[in-house]
Amino acid sequence: MQQNKAQKVIEEVKKAFIGKTECVEKLMTAILAGGHVLVEDVPGVGKTTLALAFAKAMNVAQNRVQFTPDVLPADITGFTVYNREKDGFFYRPGAVMCNILLADEINRTSPKTQAALLEVMEEGSVTVDGATRPVPSPFLVIATQNPVGSAGTQLLPQSQLDRFLICFGIGYPDAAEEMDILKSRRSGNGLEDVRPVISSQELMEMKKEVEEVFVHDQVYDYIVRLAQATRNNDALELGLSPRGSLALLKMAQARAYRKGRSFVIPADVAAEFQDVAAHRVQSVSSSGMDRVRAAAVLERILKETPAPAPEKG
């Protein structure tokens, strides 16, 4: 197993992203699991720096799109143009033709442009003028968004939220972390200190090893019971989808791998439950506090759903 390489990436990213080590670990786990990530928080806490540092540490091709109201779907997927000299049409690649797409402030653009990401996030390909083109492998979308209610923001559709493997916030640094940021960021943003430590091929190999992490039937049952509990809870009008259950499984496998284990334990599932489920479920309230209420319900579900006991032997 090559999980030590994942730790090298984490240590490299921390050169640019100071504090909040758990956020770096969450993103690394999601990358190993092969899913897309949504980072939601207020401006200025390091969302973009975190994403750019990962792209640099993994030495992969990355594009960044600042999602504003005037960004068009063709900017994302690409488009065909006519070449008069060759008397034919050719494809001009869009932003998705990379390994890591940083979709900055994704909830500030139009729903039509947001929808342009749907196919590529799920299928790993784009269709332009009837022709389907695969994106490079590996492919990952790291999207950032400001909290709903901020000026110029709008809700992402549930169908798009469900395509993000996890969603998490960063939060403000504590006093010691903020002191470190001030001392180390008087000039530059720290990204110049980040060096490539793995290749895209090594990342693909690690992802394959994650898929081979063993999952006991009792752990499968635990995931199903958690998912069923979200669907049968009166406080939630939208429970965890089967895609969400699969996301929880993948994140648990990736966490076990990163911790140096070849098997999943219930603690892996419990540790990833909130980040996988909070953006997928919906409470009966439709107010701006919906996500907060849903998180509280999920925490209660986690406490009330018994984890499988370790086997004796």
Q: What residues fall within each predicted segment?
A:
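Conserved alpha-helical scaffold flanking the Walker A/P-loop in AAA+ ATPase domains
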Residues: 25-29, 82-102
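Canonical AAA+ ATPase core
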Residues: 83-88, 109, 113, 121-213, ...
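Walker A/P-loop
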Residues: 31-68
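P-loop (Walker A) phosphate-binding loop of NTP-binding proteins
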Residues: 42, 76, 144
